[in-house]
Amino acid sequence: MIEVRDLRFHYQEKERAVLDGVSMTLKDGEYVALIGANGCGKTTLVHHLNALMRPTSGVVSVDGLDTLDDRQVWEIRRRVGMVFQNPENQIVGMTIEEDIAFGPGNLGLPPAEIRRRVASSLELVGLESYGRRVPSALSGGEKRLVAIAGILAMEPRYIIFDEPTSYLDPASRQRVLALIAGLHKRGLGIIHITHNMDDILDVDRVLVMREGKIVRDDRPEIVLSQGDWLRQQGLGMPAATALLWRLKEMGVSVRTDILDFEDVCREIAAWKSHPVESVA
């Protein structure tokens, strides 16, 4: 389990805290979304979870390992993988297989084990035939998959995805989301940062940050259906939920706690069968 207790962080002593008393957990195999307006502290928080940053005060632990203990940092970073917004920043090899082998190679593993991990990771992300290709020849979506494969080769217990679908075309976006869902089913703990609420409909919990604090921690159908409250946080709703809110504003009596379009269609069909004017 990843556990954060009363985490505070500021760059200089007299500056306002970037993180102000954050407490949270990520259990083994749990899928958690982290949302909030730009500048609220999301990326700073997750950088603390694999010891890329250290707390000013408070405790961050990964399976009982303290991120302030220099002796544990390498193991923490092996257990907690991070996929950044720009995959080019994570690709270091001349070929795809060299890049994916970089992390396991730093673990001092035997060559046969490194080759096994490279092949297994490429298979997991659906790029089995890409090993000898050069990264510069890949599309943006393929580069993101290579970055994920490099993390998987370290055999982590948790993966943090920082806006993994940003700037991707619809097909690549769906491919990345399907991969993340598959990794969750395999038992990995996932933290997913995004501004696209349609990317996180199936998470276990949604954490909302504002001004360095976690201000909401609840199920997605609770958090993502609160249209007025989300607007106050500078956030949007899933497209299906936004449609229902618009219908409600027009006087149509429909539920607004629905997140996907299939259920929206059923809700509208039910209303058409028994139309009732809403007084809300």
UniProtKB/Swiss-Prot annotation:
Protein's organism: Syntrophus aciditrophicus (strain SB)
GO cellular component, one term: ATP-binding cassette (ABC) transporter complex
General function of this protein: Part of the energy-coupling factor (ECF) transporter complex CbiMNOQ involved in cobalt import. Presumably responsible for energy coupling to the transport system.
Pathway of action: Cofactor biosynthesis; adenosylcobalamin biosynthesis
SUPFAM superfamilies named in the record: P-loop containing nucleoside triphosphate hydrolases
EC number: 7.-.-.-
Subcellular location: Cell inner membrane
Quaternary structure, from the entry: Forms an energy-coupling factor (ECF) transporter complex composed of an ATP-binding protein (A component, CbiO), a transmembrane protein (T component, CbiQ) and 2 possible substrate-capture proteins (S components, CbiM and CbiN) of unknown stoichimetry.
Signal peptide: none
Top-level EC class as recorded in UniProt: translocase
Keyword Cell membrane: yes
SMART domains, per the entry: AAA (SM00382)
PANTHER family per UniProt: ENERGY-COUPLING FACTOR TRANSPORTER ATP-BINDING PROTEIN ECFA1, HEAVY METAL TRANSPORTER
Domain ABC transporter: start-end pairs: 2-236
Topology versus the membrane: Peripheral membrane protein
Family of the protein in this entry: Belongs to the ABC transporter superfamily. Cobalt importer (TC 3.A.1.18.1) family.
NCBIfam families: ECF_ATPase_1
UniProt KW keywords: ATP-binding, Cell inner membrane, Cell membrane, Cobalamin biosynthesis, Cobalt, Cobalt transport, Ion transport, Membrane, Nucleotide-binding, Translocase, Transport
Gene Ontology BP term (one): cobalamin biosynthetic process
Molecular functions per Gene Ontology: ATP binding; ATP hydrolysis activity; ATPase-coupled transmembrane transporter activity
This protein's name: Cobalt import ATP-binding protein CbiO
Residues given in the record as ATP binding sites: G36, A37, N38, G39, C40, G41, K42, T43
InterPro entries on file: AAA+_ATPase, ABC_transporter-like_ATP-bd, ABC_transporter-like_CS, ABC_transpr_CbiO/EcfA_su, ECF_ABC_transporter_ATP-bd, EcfA_1, P-loop_NTPase
